[in-house]
């Protein structure tokens, strides 16, 4: 039986993708056909991988393999969230430092993905390596009115971005409907989220 790569090589070197924003299929046109770059949000490494983590990794792996049959170079980047509230909470519970905890579960995650045949991304940047850049971006959002500070939290104001929800084709109200999580009383809008 021929591999996916062998079967794709007999096809014309054109990839059709679904454009969620325009709700239609179209030919994929990379910004740079000599080096196609793909970014995907990776896991928060505080515990073992779950099916949602694996789904994202498998879908991206298939996409990267397809792109590699068409383009000479593909750079795949998937970030690692190695510090956040869940990691800090698990660190306190297990008495393992956040750094050691996230390192442990990143290794387990990468080994788990390898065991199901998923190739590792070319680059896995860690959130802790970009704290200064995140702070600067958040300050810019505060300064332009897209974020606000309340009760020691910084929240993104979803109503400040007129295109919020366009990709999912859901209004802010539709995204809130059926939400089972108690809304923090300090939020201006229940869909606002912590940065």
Residue ranges and their predicted role:
Residues 1-195:
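NTP-dependent nucleotidyl-transfer catalytic core
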């Amino acid at each position: 039986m021929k591999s996916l790569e062998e079967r794709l090589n007999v096809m014309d070197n054109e990839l059709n993708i679904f454009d969620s924003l325009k709700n239609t299929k179209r030919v994929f046109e990379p910004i740079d056909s000599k080096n196609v770059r793909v970014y995907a949000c990776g896991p928060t490494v505080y515990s073992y991988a779950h099916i949602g983590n694996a789904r994202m990794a498998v879908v991206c792996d298939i996409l990267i393999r397809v792109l590699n049959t068409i383009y000479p170079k593909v750079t795949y980047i998937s970030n690692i969230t190695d510090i956040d509230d869940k990691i800090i909470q698990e660190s306190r519970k297990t008495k393992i430092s956040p750094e050691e905890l996230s390192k442990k579960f990143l290794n387990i995650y990468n080994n788990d993905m390898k065991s199901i045949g998923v190739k590792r991304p070319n680059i896995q940047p860690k959130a802790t390596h970009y704290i200064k850049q995140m702070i600067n971006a958040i300050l810019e959002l505060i300064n332009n009115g897209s974020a606000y500070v309340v009760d020691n939290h910084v929240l993104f104001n979803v109503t400040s971005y007129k295109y919020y929800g366009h990709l999912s084709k859901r209004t802010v109200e539709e995204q809130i409907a059926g939400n089972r999580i108690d809304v923090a009383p300090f939020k201006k809008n229940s869909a606002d989220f912590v940065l």
